Amino acid sequence: MSGSTESKKQPRRRFIGRKSGNSNNDKLTTVAENGNEIIHKQKSRIALGRSVNHVPEDILNDKELNEAIKLLPSNYNFEIHKTVWNIRKYNAKRIALQMPEGLLIYSLIISDILEQFCGVETLVMGDVSYGACCIDDFTARALDCDFIVHYAHSCLVPIDVTKIKVLYVFVTINIQEDHIIKTLQKNFPKGSRIATFGTIQFNPAVHSVRDKLLNDEEHMLYIIPPQIKPLSRGEVLGCTSERLDKEQYDAMVFIGDGRFHLESAMIHNPEIPAFKYDPYNRKFTREGYDQKQLVEVRAEAIEVARKGKVFGLILGALGRQGNLNTVKNLEKNLIAAGKTVVKIILSEVFPQKLAMFDQIDVFVQVACPRLSIDWGYAFNKPLLTPYEASVLLKKDVMFSEKYYPMDYYEAKGYGRGETPKHAIE
């Protein structure tokens, strides 16, 4: 790339440049306004390929490597070629492999492949991994690993923040898109506007289905993958989903198994009908969530917490679940409100564990908001989320049956140590 900036609009320059007519190609002559010439060495040209991150052909065409990859399920993309290339590129020596429990069955095969084709030592991290917030680069570094591969979750924690090199492997899954398309066409009138999303494994399928249905003249459907940044378009997390305009959508459709991630969107958008397509059993179901009960239970927890004097402020230590900035902000606001604060670090939050802190009146956990939403009733003391604690302190708006924010890891969310747009101060 040339060092010239002539094509950009700039203020009048002090020097007027021209190439020297009789010099070699690595010189550049500039003439000052007083007539003196200044000779500069020209910046060397660097040929930058269009695909800087393209996996080399010798890795893609390695017959032995490709044979080893066949030991893994063909519809699961573990991105072995990309992993091998990154390990070699960074000259890594000790690799940590972190994946959810459902994929641990494949961990030893992947471990053997990487050891054989990269000449490295691998370490399988067997602790629970609920989501991308659980990436445990701290433990990996403590175990002398210089590289961690995190499977099946998106890049929630940026790679420039982690303490060692990280490669996120989404483990995208190939599914029968034609069946999804026929199912949606059978259940929704032509021209329906459907917010469609899923976990990161099915994100390619969401976008592929969108394109195919948009181009189907006989029964076109507007499939709209919503986005709450910094998540990918069409991606949803159990704690983070986009707030949708009920006037703009006829329905929401979640592609994936289970309800955990879908519930985030239903809690955030209770007035939009929700459906789920399970790609494993190929069932399409109408889903519901008892928003009234949610509001009653969480409002009661806040009311009980108002009487509390001693607050236990929990920093989640499961991977990177906790956020120290959010803890500091809550501590400051609680102290300003006349509360006594006891800070606690926990990797996992259980009712039996918190019951041991008998002198604490209220707990506020900076770990996962779904702990409070789903299991708060099981604790003998109120267990508030950062958002609910902010409502208690009159720093955020109160929720209702029509609105409960699920934007924890949004760019300005509490999960990132920021102040969300719905906050009062």
From Swiss-Prot:
It catalyses: L-histidyl-[translation elongation factor 2] + S-adenosyl-L-methionine = 2-[(3S)-amino-3-carboxypropyl]-L-histidyl-[translation elongation factor 2] + S-methyl-5'-thioadenosine + H(+). GO terms for molecular function: 2-(3-amino-3-carboxypropyl)histidine synthase activity; 4 iron, 4 sulfur cluster binding; metal ion binding. Residues 20-29 have a biased composition (Polar residues). Keywords: Cytoplasm, Iron, Iron-sulfur, Metal-binding, Phosphoprotein, S-adenosyl-L-methionine, Transferase. Pathway: Protein modification; peptidyl-diphthamide biosynthesis. One of its GO terms (biological process) is protein histidyl modification to diphthamide. Its EC number is 2.5.1.108. Its main location: cytoplasm. Residues 1-29 are annotated as: Disordered. Disruption phenotype: Increases translational -1 frameshifting. Abolishes the formation of the 2-(3-amino-3-carboxypropyl)histidine synthase complex. Resistance to sordarin and zymocin. It is found in: Cytoplasm. Pfam families: Diphthamide_syn (PF01866). Residues 1-60, 366-425 are annotated as: Required for function but dispensable for interaction with DPH2 and DPH3. InterPro entries: DPH1/DPH2, DPH1/DPH2_1, DPH1/DPH2_2, DPH1/DPH2_3, DPH1/DPH2_euk_archaea. One of its GO terms (cellular component) is 2-(3-amino-3-carboxypropyl)histidine synthase complex. Binds 1 [4Fe-4S] cluster per subunit. The cluster is coordinated with 3 cysteines and an exchangeable S-adenosyl-L-methionine. Present with 2526 molecules/cell in log phase SD medium. Belongs to the DPH1/DPH2 family. DPH1 subfamily. Catalyzes the first step of diphthamide biosynthesis, a post-translational modification of histidine which occurs in elongation factor 2. In association with DPH2, transfers a 3-amino-3-carboxypropyl (ACP) group from S-adenosyl-L-methionine (SAM) to a histidine residue, the reaction is assisted by a reduction system comprising KTI11/DPH3 and a NADH-dependent reductase, predominantly CBR1. Component of the 2-(3-amino-3-carboxypropyl)histidine synthase complex composed of DPH1, DPH2, KTI11/DPH3 and a NADH-dependent reductase, predominantly CBR1. Interacts with DPH2; the interaction is direct. Interacts with KTI11/DPH3. This is 2-(3-amino-3-carboxypropyl)histidine synthase subunit 1. The lineage of its organism: Eukaryota, Fungi, Dikarya, Ascomycota, Saccharomycotina. The gene is DPH1.
